[in-house]
């Protein structure tokens, strides 16, 4: 069984703000793109494989996109970034499971990998002379995570009263960030 699809989601955002003497009245029209793929295969009634892919687009917040510098606190200045790009996350998940009824035995293995291009991270630039910092949202690459796991269950007696259940999960997250010193 194989299915796939693409979702195109139009989004209209209106933003009105008066801040630090700056009047902002803007509209953003975007289309978020989200492809999917799902593959399922049954080896038998009790044994199956599934692989799933999903892509997701996320837009930067309207406030992050505004070209406004807030220096009301000279030690903690914030800036917007009108050049921010949308982020796109891709995820792949796979799992395999099997159950043998005559032995009351079951096991499964599964895994997931996800990566995001153009993630949005706050870039903090520290000024050693003033002790102040400037924070500005920026796109960054290199964020990803992985997860694998599995379980095993079985009866150790013929009546199925005594069972052994065990599982193992491992995960790793890789997050990138910015830090600059002037």
Question: Where on the chain are the PLM-derived regions?
Answer:
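Exposed, low-structure sequence patches enriched in small/polar residues
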Residues: 1-182
